[in-house]
Amino acid sequence: MRTELDETKATVRRALEEVRRIARELRPEMLEQLGLVSALTALATKFADVSGIAVQRRFDDELPQLSDEAELAVYRVAQDGLTNIARHSGARNVELALERGPSSVTLRLVDDGRGLGGAQPADGGGMRGMRERALLVGGALAIKTGRRGGLEVRLEVPAEGAG
């Protein structure tokens, strides 16, 4: 019984290593070359140009160092969140923020669209993908109605070496 458990643990460990390897290979070139803040700036600029939705960027200075996997998760959640905003929200404005925590970084996307209307967010492919990315890096994802209506997507990921 113990041997089977050890073999199962080893299989899970190998699978996780493979997922991480694939994620690294899928890392956008901009993220690899310029870093997270520059990659998100470029993403926001392109999004605003294509969608016509104004993006206000707010990035804290001196963000804690993130692992490559956590940076990729933040970038992909921002990308998926912006895509959902363009498709579903009817928003005219969105705030894209990176906030420094003592041992984490938080991505916030807040729009002024129609929000959830009291409903729970649909768990479509985009939302499910965001949740899975958060879990893979030990992060936490919250999706809720924003303070002034609209929708807020919040992803907190641990800094490298934290936790």
Question: What does each model-found stretch correspond to?
Answer:
Residues 1-163:
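Coiled-coil dimerization/phosphotransfer module
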